[in-house]
């Protein structure tokens, strides 16, 4: 079996994402999968996992090769908190279980990519701060955090990664541009793995703003 490039996507599904925002995310994800399937490098290496989090955290898609991937339904509750800390702990459990670290005889998977999207701030801040320490004990090629919409707070995300981006609006065209950019990140990861430990992020589109 060829070495996999695990891609973990964490999506905030708290009550405020209900309606157009989550529907737009679904369209963006669907377009991303379709684009990646057309890329021979991505098709050979990329495996996608989707974890949703609100009051509960669920891995709605375990790490799956693109050719076998069917996007599951993503549902938001009518209301509820954003347990980002619980989501990060859950992610680390999935990483420990799913990512092949390799052995002296056999190379393991490439270091995963992590994309986290939220439209708010962690409701479980103490858990979140502890979970960040745990995430940093795991190796990722890149961690990208996206703060979507006017109520999203970037300060907590900056503790997790330097790669924090904002989306000013939460409409379908903005999410589409964001997921097109995620697609390019995954494609680039598939091509540059083994050449360098950390890949440079491609330039984002105008709708996706880097937080300095």
Regions of interest found by a model, annotated:
Residues 56, 150-201, 205-207:
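Von Willebrand factor A/integrin I-like adhesion domains
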């Amino acid at each position: 079996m060829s070495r996999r490039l695990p891609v973990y996507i964490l999506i905030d599904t708290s009550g405020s994402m209900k309606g157009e925002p989550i529907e737009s995310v679904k369209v963006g994800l669907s377009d991303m999968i379709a684009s990646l399937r057309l890329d021979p490098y991505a098709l050979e290496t990329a495996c996608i996992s989707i974890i949703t989090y609100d009051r509960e955290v669920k891995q709605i898609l375990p790490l799956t090769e693109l050719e076998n991937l069917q996007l599951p339904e993503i549902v938001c509750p009518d209301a509820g908190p954003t347990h980002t800390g619980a989501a990060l702990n859950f992610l680390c459990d999935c990483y420990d279980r799913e990512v092949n670290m390799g052995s002296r005889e056999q190379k393991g998977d490439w270091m995963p990519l992590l994309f986290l999207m939220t439209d708010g701030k962690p409701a479980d801040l103490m858990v979140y701060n502890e979970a960040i320490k745990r995430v940093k004990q795991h190796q990722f090629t890149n961690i990208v955090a996206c703060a979507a919409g006017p109520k999203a707070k970037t300060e907590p995300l900056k503790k997790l990664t330097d790669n924090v981006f904002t989306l000013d609006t939460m409409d379908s065209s903005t999410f589409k541009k964001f997921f097109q950019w995620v697609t390019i990140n995954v494609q680039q990861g598939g091509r540059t793995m083994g050449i360098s430990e950390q890949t440079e992020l491609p330039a984002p589109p105008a709708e996706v703003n880097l937080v300095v």
